[in-house]
């Protein structure tokens, strides 16, 4: 279920940009500013950082995220409709070295053109599933069985960093089950995932 940008459960927002790697097609100078991903979600098309094809951004949280009851963070994209969606994979880290990726699934079977649409019923665990103003929730508890958690390199009560990775859209990146992930491709100017904000629900 989507998290609205004014949801009372939101305890805070990303505080700093740890790293940014822009991919091809992020050509709008204003939307290359990573500071646009900090603070509260605006829910508008222009207050975002465009990652470009395959681009990544890593954000720091102060205080760190913690595993609470239900979703612990929400990622907001700037999609202008409920079906024209650009997707991202989400990873978390406690130390900035070991990043653990949330499971995701995409059941689309064919490439999507630059103005194509997606069926959200075929998507799970991918940021960008909802239109602007609504964030995709992620629950740290779903990572409890991961080896990185078991050996202590990822502390689910002290998650300092969240990374969003654009899926590129051409099927070259796969979901957790080996299925190709498709979203609108190719696109230009503001290609790839456009990050509005990341919210902390438990910290």
Give names to the regions the model predicted.
Residues 1-88, 98-203:
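A domain-level signal for the mature, folded cores of soluble proteins
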């Amino acid at each position: 279920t989507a998290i609205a940008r004014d949801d009372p459960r939101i305890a805070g927002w990303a505080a700093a940009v740890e790293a940014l790697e822009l991919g091809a097609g992020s050509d709008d100078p204003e939307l290359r500013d990573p500071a646009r991903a900090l603070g509260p979600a605006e829910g508008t098309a222009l207050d975002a950082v465009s990652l470009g094809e395959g681009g990544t951004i890593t954000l720091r949280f102060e205080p760190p995220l913690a595993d609470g009851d239900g979703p612990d963070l929400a990622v907001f994209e700037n999609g202008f409709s409920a079906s024209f969606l650009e997707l991202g994979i989400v990873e978390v880290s406690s130390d900035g070295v070991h990043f653990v990726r949330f499971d995701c699934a995409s059941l689309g079977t064919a490439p999507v053109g630059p103005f194509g649409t997606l069926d959200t019923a075929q998507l799970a665990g991918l940021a960008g599933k909802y239109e602007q103003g609504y964030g995709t929730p992620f629950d740290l508890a779903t990572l409890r069985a991961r080896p990185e958690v078991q050996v202590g390199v990822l502390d689910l009560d002290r998650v300092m960093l969240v990374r969003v990775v654009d899926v590129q859209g051409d099927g070259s990146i796969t979901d957790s089950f080996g299925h190709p992930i498709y979203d609108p491709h190719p696109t230009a100017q503001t290609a790839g995932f456009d990050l509005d904000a990341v919210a902390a629900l438990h910290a």
